[in-house]
């Protein structure tokens, strides 16, 4: 009988490991408390929610390292330990305690996913062997322990290759190498983080897809959420704009990847929650499994908030031995947790970078994380969600369009010119579009505004044409609003009654409504109408708001209920939208 549980917390905040693990740890502690279990937390970071009074029964502000944890286990004698709620640090610490024999010495039961399953997913060589047993495709790779082995592996696989460090978080030490010089430099960095390095054949340009899968001890499995990265493979998922649910997968692609994710979680024997990342060839249904995280991850926190399904809470209960069918859905309070959420909205996660604060850091994005945080936006359309998200980042942007110049001028190849020819570009687009930077989304906006085709931008960025079509739709609405710039001029001279006659002119009110539906703020609309030339922009935004209210163009409050309104929701989880 489990009466006392030790939870390894999220530890210090660092790039790649931030508030997401505080969120999952807090949820797990609440789940244990509900069961009347005494909880002990180890977390050196005092500025977290999980270390607040009343969340855990006892808190140790000690580093999440095997030596310190062993002393606390010897003193507290817990019955069980949870490893998957503190990110990579907690997972590595748990594996070390297991290998040292500390857990068996003090008779501490690992709750949820067995340690061997964690080792199978973290050790790159073992991981590939385990997936080969069930005929699941992985990226062609070789595990190496020396720089000499890395060089030999790269020669065998053929360039370009990607290097990945084992047991590392946030793509630490990973990078793409096109030649031997880059390889040796990257290998040196990777070995400084980990004793084992994986050399993989590069699949740059493939789509990156993620599934969040939950399994209980009775072998019941569900996929809670699937997500798609706007950027193709080659940019770390923590650096990319992520959309949930996926938007560009066909029905057969979606179900094929879902079935494989469930097959993997069953074969490895994970109990609780795990994250499966895929590379998918945009030209066929060919796929590769990139990695499996046998823990709550950044993506889990996003999936949890995006769907309203409390992943960490459920995972903690499953670790105690419950089945999915025995747990209540915390949103509806009537259905069980054994269901797959249905979403009638779109969620966008957008990273935030603060690269100006770090001296000498390249603005180029790659397979290693640089972002320091992220925002999540909810809308009824992709356009609305991405515009809301870009406003929320807090870096002075007003949305996808309507910003002052954010990138250097772009010179793209003209029709008929070869997209890969270096002669077609000046220096700026190489950094803006060909090589992704933290402002690439605004470089895409600028290229669309300059009249370049979706196909040209797709060739440069490898962003899916569906996303580019939606982004072009935002630019088209902005252009349509600019055709009504005479309204801002007339507003200076005309009294309200006469002005309203012009506002009511054919097509404008429909356009105003469409702009709001697709995520335009009053500020963006005022800027597109040219109010900036004549008025303070704060006042101009209020003018647009006044017009909207006059013609009843107002937002609705929508509820996130996990079941697309099939059952009434008891939880107040809300968002505003114009449809």
Regions found by a protein language model. Name each.
Residues 407-431, 525:
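N-terminal low-complexity segments that are often proline-rich with Ser/Thr-Pro
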Residues 152-161:
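Acidic/histidine-enriched active-site and ligand-binding environments that engage anionic O-linkages
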Residues 513, 517-518, 523, 527-528, ...:
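Intrinsic disorder and flexible/low-complexity segments
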Residues 3, 9, 22, 27, ...:
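ATP-dependent carboxylate activation and anion-phosphoryl transfer catalytic cores
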Residues 460-469, 527-546:
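Short, basic interhelical loop/turn and adjoining N-cap
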Residues 1-133, 145-148, 389, 533-535, ...:
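ATP-binding N-terminal substructure of ATP-dependent carboxylate-amine bond-forming enzymes
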């Amino acid at each position: 009988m489990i009466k006392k549980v030790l939870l390894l917390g999220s530890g210090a905040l660092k790039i790649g490991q931030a508030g997401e693990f505080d969120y999952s740890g807090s949820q797990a502690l609440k789940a244990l408390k509900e069961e009347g279990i005494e909880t002990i937390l180890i977390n050196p970071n005092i500025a977290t929610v999980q270390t607040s009074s009343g969340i855990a029964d006892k808190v140790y502000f000690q580093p999440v390292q095997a030596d310190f944890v062993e002393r606390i286990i010897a003193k507290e004698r817990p019955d069980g330990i949870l490893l998957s709620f503190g990110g990579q640090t907690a997972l590595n610490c748990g594996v070390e305690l297991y290998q040292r024999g500390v857990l068996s010495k003090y008779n501490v039961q690992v709750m949820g996913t067995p340690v061997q399953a964690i080792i199978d997913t973290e050790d790159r060589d073992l991981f590939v062997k385990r997936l080969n047993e069930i005929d699941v495709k992985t990226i062609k790779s070789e595990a190496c322990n020396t720089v000499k082995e890395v060089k030999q592996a790269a020669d065998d696989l053929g360039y370009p290759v990607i290097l990945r460090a084992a047991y590392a978080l946030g793509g630490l030490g990973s990078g793409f190498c096109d030649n031997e010089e880059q390889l040796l430099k990257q290998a040196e960095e990777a070995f400084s983080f980990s004793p084992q390095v994986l050399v993989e054949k590069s699949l740059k340009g493939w789509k990156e897809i993620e599934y969040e899968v939950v399994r209980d001890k009775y072998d019941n499995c569900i996929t809670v959420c699937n997500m798609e990265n706007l950027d193709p493979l080659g940019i770390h998922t923590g650096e990319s704009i992520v959309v949930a649910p996926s938007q560009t997968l066909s029905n057969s692609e979606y179900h094929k990847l879902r079935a494989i994710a469930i097959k993997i979680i069953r074969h490895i024997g994970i109990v609780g929650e795990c994250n499966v990342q895929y590379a998918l060839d945009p030209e066929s249904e060919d796929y590769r499994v990139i990695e499996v995280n046998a823990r709550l991850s950044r993506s889990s926190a996003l999936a949890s908030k995006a769907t309203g399904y409390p992943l960490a809470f459920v995972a903690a209960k499953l670790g105690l031995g419950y089945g999915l069918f025995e747990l209540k859905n915390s949103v509806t309070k009537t259905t069980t947790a054994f269901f797959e959420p249905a979403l009638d909205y779109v969620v966008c996660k957008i990273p935030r970078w603060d690269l100006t604060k770090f001296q000498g850091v390249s603005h180029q994005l790659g397979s290693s994380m640089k972002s320091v945080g992220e925002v999540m936006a909810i809308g009824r359309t992709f356009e609305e969600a991405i515009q809301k998200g870009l406003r929320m980042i807090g870096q002075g942007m007003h949305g996808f369009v309507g910003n002052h110049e954010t990138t250097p001028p772009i010179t793209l190849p003209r029709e008929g010119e070869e997209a890969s020819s270096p002669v077609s570009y000046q220096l700026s687009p190489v950094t803006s579009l060909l090589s992704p930077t933290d402002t690439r989304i605004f470089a895409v906006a600028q290229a669309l505004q300059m009249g370049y085709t979706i196909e040209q931008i797709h060739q440069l960025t490898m962003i899916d044409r569906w996303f580019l079509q939606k982004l072009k739709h935002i630019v088209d609405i902005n252009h349509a609003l600019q055709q009504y710039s005479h309204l801002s001029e007339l507003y200076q001279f005309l009294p309200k009654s006469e002005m309203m006659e012009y506002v009511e002119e054919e097509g404008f009110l429909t356009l105003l409504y469409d702009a709001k539906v697709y995520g335009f703020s009053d500020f963006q609309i005022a800027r597109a109408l040219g109010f900036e030339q004549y008025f303070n922009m704060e006042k101009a935004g209020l003018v647009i708001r006044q017009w909207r209210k006059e013609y009843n163009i107002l937002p609705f409050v929508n509820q996130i209920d996990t079941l697309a309104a099939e059952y009434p929701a008891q939880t107040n989880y809300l968002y505003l939208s114009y449809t």
